[in-house]
Amino acid sequence: MAIKTDIRGMIWRYPEPFVVGREKVREFARSIKCDDAACYDEAAAAELGYDSLVAPLTFVSILAKLVQADFFRNVDTGYTTMQMVQVDQGFTFHQPIKAGDVLYARMEIASVNERFGADIVTTRNILTNAGGDIVLEAFTTMMGHEGDDSVNIKWDAESGQVVRTA
């Protein structure tokens, strides 16, 4: 196992709050071709009972990328070169993400395992608001190996799995 198992149980807090901008919500909604009026128009959001624009569900990917990059930049995981693929992810929204929200992110390393020469890491990712309430809980599973591309993986449509080819 190339990854350091002592990261298991680690809690990584993103160092800065993430402020959800109104124009960022609109820009993101346009980029994914979201046609929900509550993402663009405050009156439409108010009709649904919200006090500001509602971000599309996948908006959280913006912050998730920042948190993950910050973690790998600052934590010695044991990898010097790394090939990694995300193999699973699940979300539980406790409340919507809205323009004006101030969010705080933490990533917990829930498990670190080795299977068939690949390191498998599962993270529990929590977003809280300024009041400390949980907004989102997500679990992400990543598979990686250290070294070059001599070990190849590909998507096998027949089995619905990521498989090794060499």
Q: PLM ranges: what are they?
A:
Residues 1-4, 88, 93-166:
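HotDog/MaoC-like acyl-thioester-processing domains
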Residues 1-86, 153-166:
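Hot-dog-fold acyl-thioester-processing enzymes
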